Amino acid sequence: MSHKVTKAHNGATLTVAVGELVEIQLPSNPTTGFAWYFEGGTKESPNESMFTVENKYFPPDSKLLGAGGTEHFHVTVKAAGTHAVNLTYMRPWTGPSHDSERFTVYLKAN
């Protein structure tokens, strides 16, 4: 079984099984330089012993120049416990600021 998580789930706690896939889908527009990153400006899991991450960007169906698409993070929980997945929408060369958009979902793995 897998779980689909969107921006509407910000701050939510999901109960998942160890080894289960959670797909986080967030609006993104890399043509502006912005994308979703973990703390430290990385696309990789900040804690590989707790969960692994694969990341992919899907462009929009629109032909409009500069239209945003969707960034997908496939998160697989590797250990029991509650794990926070924290993402920040930012430009990697400037880092997060006080007004950066943030997304957090808590994965409670049994």
Curated annotation (Swiss-Prot):
Motif FG loop extends across 91-100
Coordinates of motif BC loop in the sequence?
Answer: 29-34
A GO CC term assigned to this protein in UniProt: ciliary pocket
Q: Does the keyword Plastid apply?
A: no
Motif annotated as DE loop, chain positions? 59-68
Q: Which domain of life does this protein belong to?
A: Eukaryota
Q: Where in the cell is it found?
A: Flagellar pocket; Cytoplasmic vesicle; Cell surface
* Listed Pfam families: Inhibitor_I42
**Gene Ontology MF, one:** cysteine-type endopeptidase inhibitor activity
Keyword annotations for this protein, in alphabetical order, are:
Cytoplasmic vesicle, Protease inhibitor, Thiol protease inhibitor
- Record carries keyword tRNA processing: no
Q: How does it assemble?
A: Interacts with cruzipain.
Question: Domain comment text?
Answer: The BC, DE and FG loops form a tripartite wedge that blocks the substrate-binding site of target cysteine proteases. The BC loop interacts with the catalytically active cysteine and histidine residues of the protease catalytic center.
Q: What does this protein do?
A: Cysteine protease inhibitor. Inhibits cysteine protease cruzipain.
The text of the family note is: Belongs to the protease inhibitor I42 family.
Q: What is this protein called?
A: Chagasin
Q: Which organism is it from?
A: Trypanosoma cruzi
Q: In the UniProt record, what gene is named as encoding this protein?
A: cha
